[in-house]
Structures are given as C-alpha cells and as structure tokens.
C-alpha cells in the first residue's frame, strides 16, 4: 500500500532544536576557553609589570657613591615606595598557580539549562510559524569581541601602567551588557511561549475551593424539592413540600452554606429564599467536583439553533375552517397577529379531513378536494375580518373525525409535519386533545419551547355522559400526564378548566376586529340620537346540551310566569337540535329556533341583550363578541366569565331569581358605550401582548435570560440548570416514554376510545397530502 510522505513540520522543528542546542554548547565552551586565556594573560601581565618595576628601582640606584641628599626625596619617589607593598601583594596573588582556577570558579556561568526538548517541541514550532523565523544564536557570537582588540583599542594614547585596572572595568561593563541582553532574551515572546508550554504540561491542579460535601438533610431536601410536581400530581400540596424542604435545609444551612459560597454569593443569598439557597448550594458542590450535566436519558440535543437570529413559531390546533368552532377561529387570529412581528416566522398547522369526514363536520355540505383549496378559503375568510394581509404559512396534518367524541383526532405523528429547521417554538392549542393518542416524537425534545393553551373544559362534558364520574377521573389524570410530559408552559383561559401542571390563568383570546367596528358604528348612531337596538334578547351557540341549553330551558321553565311575554331567539346548529327543540315545545317555552349564523351577521346587530347561561365553557367567545358590539350580556357567575366582570354591560347572576332580575334590568335600560381602554382590552392586539407575557415568549424572542437564576463566583456564573441534573425533567421524560409505549399498542388505544387506524395516517391521507406511506416513512426492520 502506498505511503504518503509526512509533513516536514515536526522534523524541521526537531532539527532546529538540535542545531540550536549545539550552538549554545559550543558558545559556552568558547566562553570558558576565552576566560581561561584572559586569566593566564592577566597572570603574565602581572609578572611583566613586577619585572619592570624592579628594573625601575635598580635604575634609580647609582653604581657609585653620591653625597647624601639633605633635601627630602621627591614626591613621585615617595608615591612609588608606598605603592610597592601593594604591587607586591598583587604580584603574589597573580603568580599563584590557583589563580586561573579561582577566576573560573568566580566567573563560571551558574545557570544550568535543562530543557525537555520533546516537551517544548510544539511551542517552538508555533513560534516559528507565528514569527516566520528562528532565534538567531549567531548574534551572541557576532557581539563577541576579542579581549586583546579591546585592550589595544582602549589603551592607545594612555599610560600602560594602569591598563589592567582599566581592562578589568571594561570586562565588568561587558558582562553587565551581556546580562541585560540575556534579560531581554528571557522576556522575549519566544521564551514566554516556551514557559507557558512547560507550565501547561506540568500544570498543577486548579486551585479548588474547599466545599463541604452534601449531608443527608441537604440531599433529602433537594429530592423533595425536585419531586414537588410529582408529589403534587399525587395530591400532596406544594405548601407541605416547601415546609419539608425548609425544615430539612435550615438544620444545616448556618454551618455549611457560608463555607461553600463566596462572600458575594452569601450577600445574594441573604436576599433570597430557601429554594434559591439550596439550588446554589448544590450548584457550588457540583462545580467544585468538576461535574457538568450534559443532558439526561430522555434529552434530545438535536434541537433547532436559531443561528440567523430569526425565530420560528408553529401553532398546532385541532380544528379548521369552515368549522366555526373556537379552536378553528382563535388560533387563526393568533397566527395572523403574531406574524405582524418581524422577530419570528409563523406556521399554522391545521387538520386535513378526507372528503367523507368533511361532509360530517363542515356546514352547508362544504367540502374541499385539495389542501390548497381549503387554504385559499381560510385566507379569504381571515382577510375579510382583520383588514390586512397576514404573512404566515398554513400546513396540514392528517386527521380523522370521531363522531362519539365530536372532535378531530390526529392520525400519526403530528410533530413530523413541522420541519426540523423550523422546530423552534410550538404553541399547542388544546395540548391534552392533541396528545391523548400522540405516538411520535416528544414535543419538548423537538422544540426549544412548547406552550399549551387550554380551550375546552373536557371534564364538564364528560361528567354529563354515562359513567361520567369515573371517566372524568381517568381523563383528569391523563390530561395531567400528557400536558406535563409534552409542554414547558400551559395557559388556561379561565379557572373553569382543571388545574394542570405548569399552568397559569390568562385570557389570551381577543375578538374579531369586525365586532369592534360594529360596536363603534352602534355607538355613533346612539350619539346621533338614533335607536340602535330594535330587538330584544337572543342566544347563539352550537345546538348541543352541553353548550348551556339545558340550563337555559330549566331557568325559563322555572320562571315562566315571572317572564311572561319574554321571547328569546335562538341561533345554532348541532347534533342535539331535535332533542332541544322537542324539550322546549313540550314545556311550552317561548323560544324561536333559527339556523346558525355568523355572530357578525347584519340580522343580529339590532339585538340588545345576549343571554348565555352556559357553565361548561372555558371562555365564551360569543360573550366577548356581544360586549364588543356594545350589547348587554346576562351570564352566570362562573369562573369562565371572570374576565368579563369588569365590563359594566356584563350582568352576572347567582340564582334563578337573580337571573330574572338581570334579564328585566337589561331589557329596561340601555347599554353603556365602551371606552377606548375597554375596546383595546377586547382586541387581539391586547390578547397577543398578554400571550407573549404569560407564555414567556417575549423574553425568549428577545434573547433574554429564560428565568434561571445565577450567582457570581470569582467572576464566573453558576447557572443552576447547567451544572445539575433536573429530577423534574427526568420524571417528565419517563412519563413521555411510558406514554409513547402505551400509545404504540393498538389494543390499548382502542380500549381508551381511539379511532381504529389512527396510530398512522391511511392511504387516502397519503394521496391528498402527497405523503409517503407510513411503512416507508417509518420502516420496521425484521423478518
């Protein structure tokens, strides 16, 4: 097999290091030889100096006798005599045979260079690449001058008697210069890189702060805290869990928290609560051990990453126009108003029914042959009412109509109809309904943030059926199960719904702008002195018993005499139309039944009073529309009507006698005109603003912190969710996995009321939506 030549980078670097090392060694040997020669020359110089001095004294003594000099000797001779003992000492010192050895011992280089060549190999190579050159070791040799050249150059024109001292000073200056040049070399970028490389290889463990380990009360407190939602699911109140956590953690808080956290953290915790202190205590312990939580068994890491700073919102609902129901109309308006913001792109995902199901659901025998035809109908209907062209995408998923449940059930994995590149934020309209029989990818795994909006009070409907109490009990826990497993946040339109996990109460619905315009028109007519309301009372709603018809007939039958002459027009279509009309005729009630129509129809503008006795609604859209048109509304004192109580035209009753009084009051008086603030409160602009706030989408879309608290430790953030496994997420993932396993069994699906064959879509759906067969989309490998 042919071998490819290796890149020369490493070999060149090694040869460069070897060459440099040889040059350093040779340079050191040359320096030692030069110093030895200088010492010997210094010794010879001292000997010659002593010899010349003796000759000088001998020449000063005459060979013949001279008369004694009475005058004192000259000063020069006295100086020479005084200098003679010192010169003799210098001569003896320099004549000593150990002089060269002592000089070498004094001036020998003391720094021993011990470099691990293999350890700094990579650092040398990087230095070559960055500086595009090598260290020139010849510079030292170029700077080296001959001892004798300097001696001769500096000695010209001066007396040679003091030349040894002058040369000694010159040598000392030279060593100082060489020392400064060596310091510059030590501080060079190359040496710094070598030092950093050596430090990185021999790096000591990071300075770890002594953090006391967790004790048993702390562990128990944290387990109870993380198990709060699960215990709440079992019926244990959250207040009890908080008290248990506080009692367990307070025992060890004082003597361990201050040791495990820095001063800044302690000041932060001083203003916090027990839960925050416990979370930061756990985080600090995990950080001291170097642990970092990278995701659990149920976590999917392949989520959408908004690299282009553009977010995607997918709205998934359970119904579509022309079925005039709340889950068809309200999500459509939500998509239109969310698409007005440039921060996100919006996709509305609605069910597609085969033609046989369309005939059962859509009014006036209206059917569509293709999704494109139905999309055109939806957009046309919407633009007539909002007055602007909404820029959002409409997609379809397979669905089947259940006559027993009177609702549309998804067929197959609904999440697969949102591409992974757009899987960022999901809004599930009726999350419990969408996930009862959901057998597919977990929503919270595919999407970064999942918000559920509860539209329907299913428990109230189920209680009216046979064995309703038992069914309601089972459905209640199934709803808790699926909403907890598949949602990050749940919004309940009113307190009329069951208390679901992760839920808050907020009305995030508005009214069609057309109704607000009708209200403004009626108010203008009244200001001109015209009579806007020429008719009495009416009721509009789907003709099924659960929509308030039972309560209405009971009230009118009980107070038939009190409401003598009272006439009520009823508009609606539905499965129970014949039964409701038969009951009204049997009781001889003054009810005028008419076919259902749009609430904005011109024929309904003249009615002054809208009566809605329903207590099964979560938030009655018709009530909001009647208030927007400036009418009186008589409704029950019920949590579903809590949002409307602030409007002066909303008259609520508690008893049947109170109902009669409110009806008479409304018929005898004129409604109050709406203020601009009240009109805005009913609008979709205000509803969208409330939705962004309560669903936490405003912070997510603005890239703000998602609510996780952090504390500073030596300049670093300790994020609670980044360094510790979340027991709640682990439990939620287990619930989702169990739900996936159960919904994959066809027998269990049928036992719980699923439509046969809805685990996957059928051939007709493949044909209508141009889908691959389920076995091709999700193959099963085996024999």
From Swiss-Prot:
It catalyses: a 1,2-diacyl-3-O-(beta-D-galactosyl)-sn-glycerol + UDP-alpha-D-galactose = a 1,2-diacyl-3-O-[alpha-D-galactosyl-(1->6)-beta-D-galactosyl]-sn-glycerol + UDP + H(+). Its EC number is 2.4.1.241. GO terms for molecular function: digalactosyldiacylglycerol synthase activity; UDP-galactosyltransferase activity. The keyword Ubl conjugation does not apply. Keywords: Chloroplast, Glycosyltransferase, Membrane, Nodulation, Plastid, Plastid outer membrane, Transferase, Transit peptide. GO terms for biological process: galactolipid biosynthetic process; nodulation. InterPro entries: DGDG1/2 (IPR044525), Glyco_trans_1 (IPR001296). Belongs to the glycosyltransferase group 1 family. Glycosyltransferase 4 subfamily. Involved in the synthesis of diacylglycerol galactolipids that are specifically found in thylakoid and in nodule peribacteroid membranes. Specific for alpha-glycosidic linkages. This is Digalactosyldiacylglycerol synthase 1, chloroplastic. The gene is DGD1.
